[in-house]
């Protein structure tokens, strides 16, 4: 399909289709006409913003507001939606308290309320250990280069997950764990909808959620624990099994790579040097040689992922390590990592990774190997995942734990108690969300080094098995895989796409997405400005046989 420009026009409520006017029976997002009229008389937007603190009806919550006048420059001067509409920024703290560790806690949130409200509400998910408030004036958390939802007229909220700071030290406080698992998202969504109703005089007509990584997990929290809150959810690279699976895989991968890494003068391993960039490029090129043509054309992308049966043994040196081959140890480590972690009985503990050329991209190295030239590693498996493991995922926390000594038979059990409230992999029916008419988009990069796309596909296939098959399940949930994309973005991929507009079209116009238009940004190194259709799983983008490989119009979605 041909590329279409992303929408940047602000959409006013008067332009909304009639389908957005929900019956009052849908309490999660139905409108109500009681309260002040909008817009305020004489354009008194700033005064309305100031008055929101006094008019709000939120117990146990402190609020502050500031008004941003129209045509203010966006932070950083980003090209997409560089100038903002007039809007009221609300910062709030829910249930401020002192934790058992003596630290101050509260569920923080930021809500932007545009003057040109289009009747829609968007919750933007967080990520990592959270602990910061995402700027609600920026693009959605799932794809860079897309229009600012605030600029389009959405009321937009974000939360810090119930603590301040990006480390997982909050894990010492039991309530902070609960807040980060699910409670902060519930409280933020309820508070935001109440403030929207107070400010505009009616509730949102439609409510949407968009998040990636931890934000994708948060989206799944809503689909399972609070299924009436959102009409549609985008769960990008969802961390559905972060504590019970992906973190186990991160330890497995780190141990495998560290074991073959060269040593410094003191005998300490230098993790980043287990594979050079040239080594990873060698592997990526071999993956392309083996699998690229299966989608009908050699274009540097492996779109027919199910047909890719790459074996790194083809790269093994017959003798000493050389530039055009891998050592026996390197082949063994790659084989182990891509197969996924197992215990001593051979039981799989998490999905393996798909073979994809994106493994040579900086985003893959940043998570798995890092770039430190010393024995102090900087891979995100260590700096982020180990921090979460020892502080939050283990019950009780174990601050002296050595990740290189992770026991794959016994240590997963230490994570089970928290996984029960944190992970979102067990509910593979989503009955309540489906019955209320909710729509769900999974979007996942094929070269995500932390949350395997295979794990998302496995969940989706179980979801389909419990809902009458793929065709029936596509009535409310669809999965889109992005060849080459690393974790949420990056890699040799068409990683810019507008999932929010896709949700809006599905919910408000009844247009179920068979494809999502995607493009590579002009600054992308590998394939600048390339366009592709992202195809609803199990289909993939297949070359038609003619036309430029840079143009989405040369491809069609196919299951074989």
Predicted features and spans:
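A catalytic-pocket lid/entrance helix-loop region that shapes and gates access to the active site
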Residues: 221-223, 228-344, 481
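Catalytic-loop region of hydrolases
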Residues: 31-120, 133-136, 143-144, 284, ...
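Cap/lid segment of the alpha/beta-hydrolase catalytic domain
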Residues: 126-204, 247-248, 397-422, 481-486
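Short beta-strand/loop motif that positions the catalytic acidic residue
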Residues: 442-444
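Histidine-bearing beta->alpha loop at or near hydrolase active sites
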Residues: 475-490, 521-523
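Glycine-rich nucleophile elbow surrounding the catalytic serine of serine-hydrolase chemistry
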Residues: 211-221
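Alpha/beta-hydrolase fold nucleophile elbow
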Residues: 202-213
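C-terminal motif of bacterial Sec signal peptides marking the signal peptidase cleavage site
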Residues: 24-28
